[in-house]
Structures are given as structure tokens and as C-alpha cells.
Amino acid sequence: MVKKSRRRGAAQWAAVRAQAGLTATDENEDDLGLPPSPGDSSYYQDQVDEFHEARSRAVLAKGWNEVESGEEDGDEEEEVLPLDIDDGDDEDGESSEEEEVGEDDDGGSSVQSEAEASVDPSLSWGQRKKLYYDTDYGSKSRGRQSQQEVEEEEREEEEEAQIIQRRLAQALQEDDFGVAWVEAFAKPVPQVDEAETRVVKDLAKVSVKEKLKMLKKESPELLELIEDLQAKLTEVKDELEPLLQLVEKGVIPTGRGSEYLKTKYNLYLNYCANISFYLILKARRVPAHGHPVIERLVTYRNLINKLSVVDQKLSSEIRHLLTAKDGAVKKEMTPKAKLTKTKPKSVKQAAAVALTDEPDFDGAALKYYKEMEDRQELKRKKEENSAEEQALEEQNAKRAITYQIAKNRGLTPRRKKIDRNPRVKHREKFRKAKIRRRGQVREVRREEQRYSGELSGIRAGVKKSIKLK
């Protein structure tokens, strides 16, 4: 190792001296000790300076790449503490080390090539430094480009910015939002496993008021649905079923009216059936908040609300039909009374007779009109009888008592109305006293503005002074 390094040092020294232009004669002259001439470089420099200057010239000639490799070789071959070791062992060791270094270099280059191949080409750096300097927004570059090229470049820049933004968003993780360091300082909260305690109430001992309160808190819509169920069932029983019986008997002709009655009847029954199902769920303590029956109830409620407009229009006719049916039932139960007087036919009866001449007129409608006329005639007769009886009672009745008899005041003196209320009496007394006081003593008037004369004028005969006592 020592011999090899010495040989390399001698070779380098010879190369440096050859490049510096020194020969053996120059060395001999130096050895003779003759003084150098002023034009010679040795006049200002010694051998050490010449050596370093020659070495720097050689370095500049070779280039920076060779300089770095040379410096590395020099650093490696610099000997500090020499050891007496055979050159053969050193050469074997160096050869093995060189092989290992070569293998390491091959492995590192293969790993580096694989890493470079796995990198996305869009993320790699460019080959020209000019790409990362200057700008295309200047007036010089814009003047040399057409409007179409400028718009194309702007569009490409916008697309590139969007791609970068998406890539950065995909690379974000939970740690990037800065929540982890906050959680690190958070104090751990001890979790206590609490046993679930269920309080069983004896409903037999709870009052009705408390039960209603609990029911309203648990399901406030339950009471409203129960009331709605009762109302709809009553309407079905008292109104819709009798009208449908008239439709079946033929009293009400088939048409839109009968179809409307059937639709309303079926709608009410379905609505009541869904409410009953909801009540069954509540009785079995099944949670019904997410059950489909709630949605079905809302649908039926909306349809019923839409029918309310039609119900208002047809309410008078439905009431008339129901009263007509009640009158017909009563008429069947009581025998017909013979009419003693013959009266002219009414307009409705004449219209009914006229309608019988039409071939398409239904006999059920004619029967309905006749029943309605008979009922109105009976009602008119009852009103006449009641009016005659009332007139007879008024003729035989006694005279009514007078106001004086009813009040029975006797010789009570007349009193003012204001005396009945002491508060109002004293209030009125105070108001009159203030008026009298205003005439006796002048009110204090503050000088909000400069004096401009008497507002009401000055009367010489008026004296408002107070007498001394």
C-alpha cells in the first residue's frame, strides 16, 4: 500500500512539473543556488507556490469531474499511520473491496432506475432551465402570439392547475388537518360502565291526569287520531251509509254524485282502518315512528282535506237528502191524514208533473219529489195550527205588570246617577276644583323663549292678588 501510494505521488509530481515546463536543467540550476531573474516566476514564488500553481493549472485543464474523482482518490490514498502489512494482502483486500463497491453501485443504480421508472412523468422536472423562468404574461410574449394561441395557453394552464389541485386533494390524510396534535393534548376521560336501570311504574296507581300527561309526552298525535277516528266513524254511520242506501234503492240516480259518495265512503273506511292498525301497534308497545303506516295516514289525511272543498259545496244538498229520508221514514210509520181543503198545486209539484212527461225521467226521482212535497205540506199545516193556538192564548191572557210594579221603588227619593259610583264622583269633584283653582291662582309658566307680550291680553280691571291675612 505504501509503495503504491509513493509511486502514484511520484507520477503526479512528474506530470505537474512537465505541465509547468520544468526540466532537469532547471532543477540543477535551482540546486546550484543561482539567484532568479526578475522576469522568472521563481523570483516571486518558491517551490511550494510553484507546485500549487502548477497543480491548479492542471486541475483547470482536466475539468471539474476529473478533479473531484482525483480528490477522492487522493483522500483515500493519504497515509497517516503506516502499517507493516504485505502488499499482497492489501491488493487482495482492495480487489474484494472494489468488487463489493461495484456490486453496490450496480444495485444502487438498479434501484434508482426502478424508482425513476415508477415516478409519474407529469411529476418529473423539465430538461430546460428556461421553462422555470420568465413569464408568458408580459407584453413582449403576448405581442408575438395570436389571440387563439394565448387562449390555448390559458386553457392548458387552467387544466394543469385543476390536475395539481386534484392530486393534492387525493394526497391529503387525516394528519394533514391538524387534529392529531389537539387530540394528543386532550385529557383521557375515564369511561364508566353504568348499569342500565329501568324504572317500572305501576300504572294502576297512577292517576288519569298523569297517564294523559305521559301519553302526550310519548306520542302527542295519538289523542288527535283517536278523536279523528270517532268523528269519521260517526260521519260514515250517520251520513254516508244512509246516502248509499238511497243510491242502492234508486232514489239518488247514478252519476257523479253517487260516485263521489262511494269514493268518500271507501276513503273514510281505509283511513279508519289505518288508524286502528296504529292503535294496535301502540297497544303492543311497538315503535311506530318509522313505520309505513304513518306515511299512509298522512296520505289519507291530505286526500280528505282535498275533499273538504267539495263537501262545503254539497253540504246543503246532503242535509236536504237526509232530512227527506227521515221524513219519508216517519211518513211510513204514521198513517196518511186526509186533506179537507183543496189547494192549488205548488210550483215544485207542477215542475215534477212536467218532468214526468219526459221519456228519460227516472221514476225514483219523481217519487223523491212527491215525498218532499208531502213533507213540506205537513210542516206548513203544523205551523198554521201553532199560530192559531198562540193567538187564542194571547186573547185570554192577563195584562202584564208595569215598570213601577216590577221595581217597587215606592216613595224612594230620586238620586243622581253619579252618586252610585263614589270613585267617579270624587274624580269629577277634583276636576272642577282644578278649574276653580286656575281662576284664582295663576299657573307658573317657565320662560322657554323671550317674553313677547301677554298671549291673552291685559285687562286693567282684573285683580288676581292674594289678600294678606
UniProtKB/Swiss-Prot annotation:
Residues that bear N6-acetyllysine: K140
Primary location class: nucleus
Covalent link Glycyl lysine isopeptide (Lys-Gly) (interchain with G-Cter in SUMO2), residues: K140
Bias (Acidic residues) ranges: 68-107, 149-158
Tissues of expression: Detected mainly in subsets of neuronal cells of the brain. In the 17.5 dpc embryo, mainly expressed in the olfactory bulb and cerebral cortex. Postnatally, additionally expressed in the cerebellar cortex, most strongly in the hippocampus.
Record region (Disordered): 17-44, 62-158, 410-469
Keyword Phosphoprotein: yes
InterPro entries associated with the record: Sas10/Utp3/C1D, Sas10_C_dom
Keyword Phosphoprotein annotated: yes
Classification via PANTHER family: SOMETHING ABOUT SILENCING PROTEIN 10 (PTHR13237:SF8), SOMETHING ABOUT SILENCING PROTEIN 10-RELATED (PTHR13237)
Similarity comment text for this entry: Belongs to the SAS10 family.
Protein name: Something about silencing protein 10
Source lineage: Eukaryota, Metazoa, Chordata, Craniata, Vertebrata
Gene, per the UniProt record: Utp3
